[in-house]
Curated annotation (Swiss-Prot):
Residue(s) of cross-link: Glycyl lysine isopeptide (Lys-Gly) (interchain with G-Cter in SUMO2): 178
Name the UniProt record assigns to this protein: Zinc finger protein 658
SUPFAM superfamilies assigned: beta-beta-alpha zinc fingers, KRAB domain (Kruppel-associated box)
Zn finger (C2H2-type) location: 325-347, 352-375, 381-406, 412-434, 440-462, 518-540, 546-568, 574-596, 602-624, 630-652, 658-680, 686-708, 714-736, 742-764, 770-792, 798-820, 826-848, 854-876, 882-904, 910-932, 938-960, 966-988, 994-1016, 1022-1045
Highest taxon in the source lineage: Eukaryota
Pfam families: KRAB (PF01352), zf-C2H2 (PF00096)
Keywords: DNA-binding, Isopeptide bond, Metal-binding, Nucleus, Repeat, Repressor, Ribosome biogenesis, Transcription, Transcription regulation, Ubl conjugation, Zinc, Zinc-finger
InterPro entries associated with the record: KRAB, KRAB_dom_sf, Krueppel_C2H2_ZnFinger, Znf_C2H2_sf, Znf_C2H2_type
GO molecular function: transcription cis-regulatory region binding; zinc ion binding
Amino acid sequence: MNMSQASVSFQDVTVEFTREEWQHLGPVERTLYRDVMLENYSHLISVGYCITKPKVISKLEKGEEPWSLEDEFLNQRYPGYFKVDHIKGIREKQEKPLWQEIFISDADKTLSKEGQKVLEKPFNLEIAPELSEKISCKCDSHRMNLPVASQLIISERKYSRKKTEYMNVCEKLQLDIKHEKAHAEEKSYEHGENAKAFSYKKDQHWKFQTLEESFECDGSGQGLYDKTICITPQSFLTGEKSCKDDEFRKNFDKITLFNHMRTDTRGKCSDLNEYGTSCDKTTAVEYNKVHMAMTHYECNERGINFSRKSPLTQSQRTITGWSAFESNKCEENFSQSSAHIVHQKTQAGDKFGEHNECTDALYQKLDFTAHQRIHTEDKFYLSDEHGKCRKSFYRKAHLIQHQRPHSGEKTYQYEECAKSFCSSSHPIQHPGTYVGFKLYECNECGKAFCQNSNLSKHLRIHTKEKPCDNNGCGRSYKSPLIGHQKTDAEMELCGGSEYGKTSHLKGHQRILMGEKPYECIECGKTFSKTSHLRAHQRIHTGEKPYECVECEKTFSHKTHLSVHQRVHTGEKPYECNDCGKSFTYNSALRAHQRIHTGEKPYECSDCEKTFAHNSALRAHHRIHTGEKPYECNECGRSFAHISVLKAHQRIHTGEKPYECNECGRSFTYNSALRAHQRIHTGRKPYECSDCEKTFAHNSALKIHQRIHTGEKPYECNECEKTFAHNSALRAHQNIHTGEKLYECSECGKTFFQKTRLSTHRRIHTGEKPYECSKCGKTFSQKSYLSGHERIHTGEKPYECNVCGKTFVYKAALIVHQRIHTGEKPYECNQCGKTFSQRTHLCAHQRIHTGEKPYECNECGKTFADNSALRAHHRIHTGEKPYECNDCGKTFSKTSHLRAHLRTRSGEKPYECSECGKTFSEKSYVSAHQRVHTGEKPYECNVCGKPFAHNSTLRVHQRIHTGEKSYECNDCGKTFSQKSHLSAHQRIHTGEKPYECNECGKAFAQNSTLRVHQRIHTGEKPYECDECGKTFVRKAALRVHHTRMHTREKTLACNGFGKS
């Protein structure tokens, strides 16, 4: 005889609650209920029960409440809408009846060592096919014909719960037991103390009348109707059982026992050998469950115990990478049946419904129903915690969970560490953190996680996946429900960014809408996110809850701590794709990449100057506003930047935290250390685009470029004089104030600038830290080294705008320009004489004081000028470093070389203002001008004879001393003057270097050439005072005066004069 198989749905092995019933359960009872339900479902899956994951299981796995007002609301609007399709889908996909795979007879059951029932031989429960085909259920309450019993159950449960019509079980077939129960509203279980009746499922009774037996809990000796409470994994095989309470001796079903144990807290179970203490019944059951379950399922790979088989199975699949379910179309593998079924619906295009208002197609029923609330804007639940937020919710579970932060309630507690949580999912997730095992590992980077959801979020970093997309604006969202919470008009505000988290999306939407609902009660500042508000409030409270375990430094933000810890680890996870440079912070990488792109997105509204960083723009704004918000507590000085303040405070503390690894020298600033290290490396990364000169520092390059641009941005407020360098301005301002802050401890000399004092100290110490890489010569100042290096390179970067002459040093250019301007800013306080150079003034003042601080180590001779001492040293060494490029002649002084070059070129740039006479050297002009003034400042100490020139005085003094220090090497003749020796030597050599431009005649001496040139010019500069006759040479004047006028006077005295 042909028989059809009757299949069983998941509802046959589950317990459902109404809203009122769920309210009576306590936290421990709800947790126990969740564990039982999840365990039952895991065993159904393990024996091949293929089904889309029930909604109640999904809720329990997420830690949500299994009952919500949404279910009741949807069933009122769409009676039987969900369970019909669910049952149809199961029957269409099921290849053979599940009765054969799940249920076994009582005779075929055996008991394992752990006390679990083992499935060995299945049995069949058969129904006549003619009856099976005619099954049709009718609801008498509202006269509806329903195709299956489950649909009738839903309809009757919602509309006719108060009716008490009874149906014959045998006449209506056992399949209508649920419908009969809904009409009967039977209440067969009663508590003896308060005679309260309860209504729960009894549909297992007719199927398993022969399987009734009573289970007793080994831990407390308490009789229970269902061994599930005592951790029997086959609770779905048992029908209703007898539950025995030791105190009341009453029978209860599962949920009645839960409620009874919740109210009856007086009862204690005394003999718990596992824990050695007495406790209430609820705690005993829970402890017994935890104790026994942890030993049932153990992972051999990781050594971790599980209370249910499903986590063990999932753990093993994670380790082995085994996937039980494979897609036929795309060959994608899945470790869970629920994920496989959802994937098949996606590929097949099996969409539950398409919404009429927005044409969005959704794959799941819950998504469709929840999506409808977006358009209707139905939010049933309103939070009114003392008028704090007035926030509304679609679901009551969300409202309850939202209210816990307001009330401070933490209902769920983890017993290992006594930590409590607001959400039921948190203590479930917490043990993984507490124990330290992480089941879920990333295949890309090897990072492990306690929760699969965290692994899924982490994988989006590698895949850059944004899970869901809204067609309205091109954005990606966490779910279709969140994606449609804003209209397409709102989405047009930006260009399609993507977000992988719901919180990110909501925060981004508030930015677009300008919404800032969270306000600080201290300062009134508003924020778009509550996390931003909490972080901001720590500014007022000073709270820094995050502490570094390495250095004990505390931070107000957890992200700041994470970033700080990279200082200790040296981690630089962010790498530039262009140059490969790595950075500690992502923001630093983005800022660095602007170097390659040249992007400067931040523009000043006052001067339109652009910046690569927003911080640089803010700092720049303070130039316009003059704001200096950061003040030093020690000296009261204020600064525009906090970094400058911190660096300034090191002056007071003396701290120098930055040390050079090469030489051990320490610095106050990190930038100073980096600049110093370039001395060791010789690196000069900054190059001038005009002259290609390189510099070790960017600031030096900017200062150098002012030479080409002529820019002088620093102006003196007193005299309006401008300067190219800020340091030069500060030094100049000390001239007006007369203040000299820096004093030498050795000699007491004071200076305007600290750098001048540092340079001066090297005179006492003899330190010369700057060495020439070409010749090894050392210098006390870096500027001296730079000037010296130009001798090797021949570079003369400073050019005169008037005559085009170039100079090695800028100071030489400035002095030269005074020739054209006639400026002599330095005046002698004694005689009022002015000088174009400060050094000339200092040398002149020594004439009045008689000071000669520079002494020759060879002969002990002293000099007023250091340059004169150096020139004197060359007499002993015979050094003549200055060579003429035309004739090869060398000179000991550069002034002699310049005079020699002018002799060859005939250049005479210096002109007498009185007579217009020109000279090749400036000293010649000064000496010549004394002819007009009659000044003779140099006087002989022996005879008192004055002289116009110092050189003439020195020559004269040799008459008194008889000194003739210059000797001819050829004939041994000695001379008192070097010029006389040079002239004498030309007799031996026959050299005549001085040539007349008019007739080409050559002479041995320059004085002879000058006398000869008077023949061509007709000049007779020497005039007789007696008769007014003029002569070309001075010697001729003397002869004339002797012969004519002296002789006449002699004759007149002797009586021979004319009568």
